[in-house]
């Protein structure tokens, strides 16, 4: 189980001044000493509707104290340095308290999506061997705690609703003999891969802080600003984009989840937010219906980040020329990809919408945090040769202080180049019209990108094949205006068998514990699936056939 960087890497990054001794919780202690009464975390006002718990507003000092008390309680239950704890919570203050509490203990937190069911939780247990799982009794009626107990068997499940009070000890001293290793794993996030199951991505404090500094540089964050986080606090977008910048700059973290557009727009105004992220479909809608935006007072708001799919140049133009708000385009991953297109490095809305600076590429210079330490290039995915000619697609490869060391329990084959660059699996090209920038072309693999959430098609293939009277089955992406891509189930019935309905397919996958957001939203029946000479389904051809049907 690879959970820690090599001594060689630690020495290299430390000597370069890119890694240090700060931890997530040491930053909190520093902030609490400087501004004890500044707000640190603010719950969404509809929290009671989500979990039944009251919405809270914690100062920096209160967050430091309750996270220390929570750490002591977890220690009394057997959690120690090096342990792994799965946490399945929505964006609420309890989740933030647990990040800091587990950081203080030196334990690794594995945050998971609240949509995940028994199928995914069982996999996490097998891969991670967690000491416990922490969740909530119900989320909008969904019995998360009971679902986890059913899936995990003898692994303890602790419920923040009525079993684990993370707010106890509000008046206790925050000081303690806390962990101080910035190179220890802080999180194990999860990402989908072509193996058909999510892969664990261990990341240390130093890796996360490198990403947080890069985001902070791009957003020009200042001390004491206020952030609104509408995305699940479980991956690069929210951890590298909100949690760590908030700790680095002593900022207030206002929470929101799941996306409720009227509430989100109201929070932006009422909480006097300076920075937020927003999904492209929402930004497009606001640009097309400016009256939705202009009914509010957003004078405090400076910057909005977005990404996951190409942005609209027209949207960027409306936000910047009419609304006076800067748009940043992010392209990242849990493994440590962090391409950022800003007003400074990509002034044109047309370029910023679809292109990203070639950070650290030979002959290309952009100002950034860790300038010269973050390097990117394009390799031929088959030969490994470096591609320097514009317009020739290849695999994006990344090297830098924010890049992880490798997947959990993985042999590393195909993950890194011989000289240590992470092979992203994403196809990019040097833009012929703007050779200082990359253009995203597609993906080397077949991952489905549903609204920024990447899904593994082979995982669903395996659950459909041999079931429901099917001779063959595979899923593929199809284009969707709002989410970018959705899932289509492509089936070949056994001879003389009736094809299943879409509802039957969805019910079957649900019975296997598959999360709702992974379920197919379209069904197509075929006489045979397109395959290559080795018998592998040609998913790109399959997608073309699906989309040709309208």
Each predicted region: which residue ranges?
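ANL superfamily adenylate-forming
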Residues: 6, 45-52, 56, 139-182, ...
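Conserved AMP-binding/adenylate-forming core of the ANL superfamily
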Residues: 18-20, 37-92, 96-100, 117-122, ...
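Conserved AMP-binding A3 loop
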Residues: 57-61, 186-210
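Structural core segment of the AMP-binding/adenylate-forming
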Residues: 76-77, 105-169, 495
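AMP-binding/adenylate-forming catalytic core of the ANL superfamily
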Residues: 116-123, 133-135, 276, 400, ...
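Adenylate-forming
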Residues: 135-145, 231, 257-259, 273-318, ...
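Conserved AMP-binding/adenylation subdomain of ANL enzymes
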Residues: 209-226, 234-275, 283, 289-290
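Conserved AMP-binding/adenylate-forming
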Residues: 269, 304, 311, 315-328, ...
């Amino acid at each position: 189980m690879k959970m820690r960087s090599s001594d060689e890497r630690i020495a290299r990054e430390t000597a370069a001044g890119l890694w240090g001794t700060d931890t997530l919780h040491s930053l909190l202690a520093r902030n609490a000493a400087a501004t004890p009464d500044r707000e640190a975390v603010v719950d969404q006002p509809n929290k009671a509707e989500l979990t039944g718990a009251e919405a809270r507003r914690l100062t920096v000092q209160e967050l430091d104290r309750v996270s220390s008390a929570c750490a002591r309680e977890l220690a009394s239950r057997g959690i120690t340095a090096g342990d792994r704890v799965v946490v399945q919570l929505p964006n609420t203050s309890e989740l933030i308290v647990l990040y800091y509490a587990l950081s203080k203990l030196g334990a690794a937190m594995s945050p998971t999506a609240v949509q995940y069911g028994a199928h995914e939780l069982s996999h996490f247990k097998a891969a991670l061997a967690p000491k416990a799982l922490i969740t909530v009794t119900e989320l909008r009626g969904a019995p998360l705690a009971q679902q986890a107990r059913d899936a995990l068997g003898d692994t303890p499940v602790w419920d923040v609703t009525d079993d684990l009070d993370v707010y106890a000890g509000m008046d206790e001293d925050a000081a303690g003999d806390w962990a101080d290793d910035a190179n220890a794993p802080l999180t194990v996030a999860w990402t989908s891969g072509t193996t058909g199951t999510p892969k664990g991505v261990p990341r240390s404090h130093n890796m996360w802080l490198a990403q947080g500094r890069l985001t902070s540089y791009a957003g020009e964050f200042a001390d004491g600003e206020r952030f609104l986080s509408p995305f699940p606090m479980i991956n690069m977008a929210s951890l590298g984009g909100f949690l760590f910048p908030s700790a680095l700059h002593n900022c207030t973290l206002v929470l929101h989840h799941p996306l409720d557009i009227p509430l989100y727009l109201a929070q932006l105004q009422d909480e006097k937010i300076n920075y937020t992220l927003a999904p492209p479909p929402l930004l497009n809608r606001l640009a097309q219906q400016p009256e939705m935006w202009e009914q509010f007072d957003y004078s405090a708001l400076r910057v909005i980040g977005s990404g996951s799919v190409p942005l609209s140049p027209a949207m960027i133009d409306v936000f910047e020329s009419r609304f006076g708000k800067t748009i940043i385009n992010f392209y990242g991953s849990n493994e440590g990809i962090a391409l950022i297109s800003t007003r400074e490095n990509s002034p044109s809305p047309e370029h910023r919408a679809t292109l990203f600076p070639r950070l650290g590429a030979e002959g290309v210079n952009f100002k950034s945090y860790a300038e010269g330490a973050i390097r990117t290039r394009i390799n031929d995915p088959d030969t490994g040769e470096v591609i320097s000619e514009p317009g020739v697609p290849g695999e994006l490869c990344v090297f830098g202080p924010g890049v992880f060391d490798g997947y959990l329990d993985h042999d590393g084959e195909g993950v890194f180049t011989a000289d240590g660059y992470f092979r992203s699996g994403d196809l990019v090209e040097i833009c012929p019209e703007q050779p200082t920038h990359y253009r995203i072309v597609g993906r080397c693999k077949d991952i489905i990108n549903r609204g920024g959430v990447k899904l593994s098609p082979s995982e669903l293939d395996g659950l459909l094949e041999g079931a429901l009277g099917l001779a063959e089955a595979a899923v593929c992406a199809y284009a969707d205006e709002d989410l970018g891509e959705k899932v289509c189930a492509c089936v070949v019935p056994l001879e003389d068998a009736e094809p299943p309905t879409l509802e039957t397919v969805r019910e079957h996958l649900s019975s296997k514990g598959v999360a709702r957001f992974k379920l197919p939203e379209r069904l197509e029946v075929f006489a045979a699936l397109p395959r290559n000479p080795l018998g592998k389904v040609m998913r790109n051809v399959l997608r073309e056939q699906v989309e040709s049907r309208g």
